[in-house]
Design a protein with these regions (language model features):
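N-terminal intrinsically disordered, low-complexity, charge/repeat-rich segments that act as generic
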Residues: 1-56, 61, 65
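Short, basic/aromatic beta-hairpin or loop at an interaction surface
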Residues: 60-77, 115
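Short alpha-helix capping/helix-loop boundary micro-motifs
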Residues: 77-84
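Short, well-ordered loop/turn sites that connect or cap secondary structure elements
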Residues: 87-89, 94
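Hydrophobic beta-strand signal
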Residues: 94-95, 140
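Short beta-strand-centered aromatic/proline hotspots
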Residues: 100-110
């Protein structure tokens, strides 16, 4: 049986040398926060996301979120429809138009196969409404080189 290289700790450094941006458009703006949401980050730091899929963006101000951790303090940002698919990874920057929303902290599969919860970290926890996001805005997820 094959072993998951992330779960078994086989990767000693980030294997993603270079990758294309993932592009989408915001289709829903959300406006709710929770203090005890209990999102469970999966063990893997990456997801392959296909064109035409719709996924949810959620923001947390909890520091130290990692694969396998639980996230409680969240703000709902919105749903994005993917127009150019790709591979997204923890640490990638997420932009609305040219505004940095945060960096990917992990992925929760609560609602799969319907959609992923893509959890972003930012120092301030704000909803999509708080951030002034409007459906139709461009979402770009871009690799951050160390």
């Amino acid at each position: 049986m094959a072993v998951d290289p992330y779960k078994s700790g086989q990767f000693k450094k980030n294997p993603y040398f270079a990758k294309s941006d993932l592009v989408g458009r915001l289709v829903v703006t959300l406006t709710t926060t929770y203090e005890t949401r209990g999102l469970q980050m999966i063990a893997q730091p990456s997801r392959c996301i296909c064109e035409k899929q719709i996924h949810e963006l959620i923001l947390t101000d909890e520091e130290g979120v990692a694969c396998g951790s639980t996230v409680n303090r969240i703000a709902y940002v919105g749903f994005v429809e993917i127009t150019e698919g790709g591979v997204i990874t923890n640490g990638d920057a997420v932009y609305y138009n040219d505004q940095l929303l945060g960096h990917i902290a992990g992925f929760d599969e609560t609602h799969m196969p319907n959609h992923y919860n893509i959890v972003l970290y930012a120092p301030e926890r704000k909803t999509g409404e708080d951030l002034g996001l409007v459906p139709g805005g461009r979402i770009v997820i871009r690799q951050v080189k160390a």
